[in-house]
């Protein structure tokens, strides 16, 4: 819970640490049992947990990829990148061979935006860092010590009670220490407001990049599905503004890289 499993298998796609993620590895007794588990899990997850994104997949051989079919949209402006990505997703959903089309940025998440009034902060001897630490300690908590249990070190975290962390009015009452040793409410030096933002923004070669991804139905090959969708995106590519592009990824790209490495050594083997 909170991250992926250890790399027990070379082709396993490693996952970043994040609180909204969990992964389970299930070992079946035989091939038939594995197929029954996959079918049953997919049915249960679709019917009983419609509000989450869940996958029941077989461990695949080959280069590690998160999703077999992927298209990357790169550009400079977040809204424009998302607009193009939505059109790519629409083309992917139109394919009868794709499942669970989504993009890696995820849905916009609620957050608290804090705008520090630098003039007031300087007058009271408050720094932006002290405002950040006070709010972080009240909401997420601050590690104040560690407890040793056998060979494990467990962090001791100090934070406000759950009822206070979830109430906006309690957050606004958080006290921020000043240079004189006194404390002032955070609202005296900053404006705190609720907003929504992207939970994560990926970049590739320093460019904003949003990857649209999909699983595939059984009985088809990912490169074939990706190439068919890629042909459908030709018109969209021709209309892209300057500085924006759509690139193919997933299994097709990784297979191409693997083939290039094989081809690079081929002349040497023939010469030998």
Question: How does the language model describe each region?
Answer:
Residues 10-11, 65-77, 118-119, 160:
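Short, low-order "capping/linker" segments at domain edges
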Residues 31-32, 74-81:
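Short, surface-exposed ligand-recognition loops at beta-strand->loop->(often short) alpha-helix junctions
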Residues 82, 89-269:
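Extracytoplasmic/periplasmic membrane-proximal domains and adjacent transmembrane bundles
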Residues 71, 85-88:
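Cysteine-centered nucleophilic/redox motifs
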Residues 6-8, 66-69, 110, 156:
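Surface-exposed aromatic
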Residues 14-21, 53-68, 72-74, 102-109, ...:
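Flexible hinge/switch segments at interdomain interfaces of large molecular machines
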Residues 21-26, 68-72, 112-114, 211-213:
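Active-site-flanking beta-strand signature of metal-NTP-handling nucleotidyl enzymes
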């Amino acid at each position: 819970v909170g991250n992926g499993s250890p790399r027990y298998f070379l082709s396993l796609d490693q996952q970043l640490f994040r609180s909204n993620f969990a992964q389970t590895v299930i070992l079946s007794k035989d091939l038939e049992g594995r197929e029954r588990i996959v079918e049953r899990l997919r049915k249960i997850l679709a019917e009983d947990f419609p509000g989450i994104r869940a996958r029941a997949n077989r461990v695949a051989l080959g280069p590690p990829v998160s999703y077999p079919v992927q298209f990357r949209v790169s550009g400079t402006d977040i809204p424009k990148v998302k607009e193009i990505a939505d059109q790519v997703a629409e083309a992917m959903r139109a394919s009868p061979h794709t499942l669970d089309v989504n993009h890696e940025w995820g849905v916009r998440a609620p957050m608290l935006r804090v705008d520090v009034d630098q003039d007031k902060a300087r007058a009271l001897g408050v720094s932006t860092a002290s405002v950040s630490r006070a709010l972080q300690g009240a909401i997420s908590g601050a590690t104040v010590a560690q407890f040793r249990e056998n060979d494990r070190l467990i962090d001791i975290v100090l934070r406000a009670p759950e009822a206070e962390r979830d109430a906006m009015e309690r957050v606004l009452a958080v006290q921020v220490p000043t240079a004189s040793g006194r404390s002032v409410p955070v609202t005296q030096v900053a404006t705190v407001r609720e907003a929504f933002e992207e939970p994560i923004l990926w970049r590739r070669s320093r460019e904003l990049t949003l990857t649209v991804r999909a699983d595939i139905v059984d009985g088809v090959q990912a490169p074939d599905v990706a190439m068919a969708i890629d042909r459908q995106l030709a018109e969209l590519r021709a209309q892209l503004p300057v500085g924006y592009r759509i690139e193919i990824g997933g299994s097709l790209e990784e297979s191409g890289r693997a083939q290039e490495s094989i081809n690079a050594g081929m002349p040497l083997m023939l010469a030998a």
